[in-house]
């Protein structure tokens, strides 16, 4: 990759505080543009014009890339060219105004309240059981992102006040309440593990923070062990937290703050889940819900 591309990634990491996960996605997206440019012999990516970028998007679409992936790929390219304009390397952003096909937004799958409670209540008669119980309870209690949970240290938890402090997307810090069941599980796990303030709450095999992949695999194993029909994954617990909280409170802004969403439109998807639930209740209970008018 060119020096300018590497400088752009350094800018995203240092000045924008972009996580390594998002940065890797940007690298793949910009890398795809560079690879396409090499195949088409169109020259350096910094010199591409609007028509060439549109041809790139069309080629990716024909290759079978989903609308969501195309939108993300175009967003990365748009950000790169915006940065080039601001740094004075090019005069016009060739990606400005380009649009990818709209993605159909799927509603997130969730556990209902009974399923969620049943899932997190695993036996705690072993050290691994204590860890897993604390991990699941905290996930469902506070709606953390997977990356936030993996990176959590003991000094980010205030067990007396019942609060957890995490560094979310864009290096935005937020403080989220921790429920009583999660606090109890965390206290037991703390007493068993003996972790210091600077130590990860959930250490991996070699003492560092547990990996996202390890959590994904463990949650899948626990769900299968309980005979759950649904494919349970870490983000499902976050989705369930948000949906159940919104269902009980109706406070969209409050749920937005707890989830750490910068844009409330991201949170609004849970209102559709809530409406979906209410529609099912209505259809099942109302005497005239499914009857045809005479």
From Swiss-Prot:
Q: Does the keyword Cell cycle apply?
A: yes
- Spell out the SUPFAM superfamilies in the cross-references: DNA breaking-rejoining enzymes
Subcellular locations according to the entry: Cytoplasm
Q: Does the keyword Membrane apply?
A: no
**UniProt entry keywords in alphabetical sequence:** Cell cycle, Cell division, Chromosome partition, Cytoplasm, DNA integration, DNA recombination, DNA-binding
Q: Which GO terms describe its molecular function?
A: DNA binding; tyrosine-based site-specific recombinase activity
Offer a single GO CC term for the protein: cytoplasm
Q: Which residues form the active site?
A: 145, 169, 235, 238, 261, 270 (o-(3'-phospho-dna)-tyrosine intermediate)
User: What residue stretches are annotated with the Tyr recombinase domain?
Assistant: 106-283
Q: Name one GO biological process term.
A: DNA transposition
| Residues covered by the Core-binding (CB) domain | 1-85
Q: Write out the similarity annotation.
A: Belongs to the 'phage' integrase family. XerC subfamily.
Matching entries from PANTHER family are given as: PHAGE INTEGRASE-RELATED, TYROSINE RECOMBINASE XERC
The task this protein performs is described as:
Site-specific tyrosine recombinase, which acts by catalyzing the cutting and rejoining of the recombining DNA molecules. The XerC-XerD complex is essential to convert dimers of the bacterial chromosome into monomers to permit their segregation at cell division. It also contributes to the segregational stability of plasmids.
Describe its assembly.
Forms a cyclic heterotetrameric complex composed of two molecules of XerC and two molecules of XerD.
Q: What is this protein called?
A: Tyrosine recombinase XerC
Identify the species of origin.
Xylella fastidiosa (strain Temecula1 / ATCC 700964)
Q: Which gene encodes it?
A: xerC
């Amino acid at each position: 990759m060119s020096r300018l591309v590497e400088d752009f990634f350094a800018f995203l990491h240092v000045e924008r505080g972009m996580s390594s996960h998002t940065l890797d996605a940007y690298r793949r997206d910009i890398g795809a543009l560079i690879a396409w440019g090499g195949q088409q012999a169109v020259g350096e990516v910094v010199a591409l014009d609007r028509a060439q970028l549109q041809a790139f998007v069309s080629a990716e679409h024909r290759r079978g890339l989903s609308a969501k992936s195309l939108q993300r790929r175009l967003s990365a390219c748009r950000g790169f060219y915006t940065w080039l304009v601001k740094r004075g390397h090019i005069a016009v952003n060739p990606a400005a105004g380009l649009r990818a096909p709209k993605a159909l937004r799927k509603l997130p799958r969730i556990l209902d309240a009974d399923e969620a409670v049943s899932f997190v209540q695993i036996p705690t008669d072993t050290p691994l059981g204590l860890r897993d119980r604390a991990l699941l309870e905290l996930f469902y209690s506070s709606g953390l992102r997977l990356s936030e949970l993996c990176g959590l240290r003991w000094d980010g938890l205030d067990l007396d006040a019942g609060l957890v402090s995490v560094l979310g997307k864009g290096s935005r810090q937020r403080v989220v309440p921790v429920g009583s069941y999660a606090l109890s599980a965390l206290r037991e796990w703390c007493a068993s593990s003996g972790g210091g303030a600077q130590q990860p709450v959930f250490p991996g095999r070699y003492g560092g923070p547990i990996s996202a992949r390890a959590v994904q695999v463990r949650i899948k194993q626990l769900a299968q062990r309980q005979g759950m029909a649904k494919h349970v994954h870490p983000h499902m617990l976050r989705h369930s937290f948000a949906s159940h909280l919104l269902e009980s409170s109706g406070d969209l802004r409050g749920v937005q703050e707890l989830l750490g969403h910068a844009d409330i439109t991201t949170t609004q998807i849970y209102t559709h889940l809530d409406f979906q639930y209410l529609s099912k209740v209505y259809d099942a209970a109302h005497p005239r819900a499914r009857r045809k008018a005479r």
